[in-house]
Amino acid sequence: MQSIKLVVVGDGAVGKTCLLISYTSNSFPTEYVPTVFDNYSANVMVDNKTVSLGLWDTAGQEDYDRLRPLSYPQTDVFLICFAIISQTSYTNVKSKWWPEVTHHCPNCTIILVGTKCDLREDKESLEKLREKHQQPLTFQQGEQMAKEIKAFCYMECSALTQKGLKQVFDEAIKAVIFPDRDKATNKKNSKCSIL
């Protein structure tokens, strides 16, 4: 059985731990808990192929910049995450996370993930953004960033509603076990462009 190591990175509070907890337990943590997710391993079936999936959470805060890369060796696929309601986390994809990941793992597969997509329609979140003269990031902005960092694809999900959540992990697994898939064909025919 093939083993896959998946590491999740991104700014603090973009929802990395919630993404992992929601995926592995089908429940959403109700309070913010900075990185308490233990490494998790499970057998997962994707396209009639069973793989042993190892999930690794990381702390996004600067305090952990020197420790975080210790979890990178032997990584098969990274999920670089940003919150669709945080311009700063989006900007940091290119200025911090992509350079860090590609420095330590130059040939690794990257999936860019826009988290908290449920908040694109949330009145309270939209009002807070309006007060700062901002708006949620668009799917097209995510796709553009994915092209710029040469990510395998861009996907969006919500750990709260689980919309697109399973598809993110399925796509990450497929990107590793079927590396020769034509990306152009993949973008047209797969679940990679989920809203």
UniProtKB/Swiss-Prot annotation:
GO-annotated biological processes: actin filament organization; actin filament polymerization; aggregation involved in sorocarp development; chemotaxis; cortical cytoskeleton organization; establishment or maintenance of cell polarity; macropinocytosis; regulation of actin cytoskeleton organization
Modified residues (Cysteine methyl ester): 192
Record's keyword terms, sorted: Cell membrane, GTP-binding, Lipoprotein, Membrane, Methylation, Nucleotide-binding, Prenylation
Protein location: Cell membrane
GO terms for MF: GTP binding; GTPase activity; protein kinase binding
Propeptide residue range(s): 193-195
GO-annotated cellular components: cell projection; cytoplasm; cytoplasmic vesicle; cytoskeleton; lipid droplet; plasma membrane
InterPro entries hit by this protein: P-loop_NTPase (IPR027417), Small_GTP-bd (IPR005225), Small_GTPase (IPR001806), Small_GTPase_Rho (IPR003578)
Covalently lipidated residues, kind S-geranylgeranyl cysteine: 192
Binding, GTP: 10-17, 57-61, 115-118
Membrane topology designation: Lipid-anchor
Pfam families linked to this entry: Ras
Residue window of motif Effector region: 32-40
Family of this protein: Belongs to the small GTPase superfamily. Rho family.
Subunit structure: Interacts with pakB.
Name the record gives this protein: Rho-related protein racB
Organism: Dictyostelium discoideum (Social amoeba)
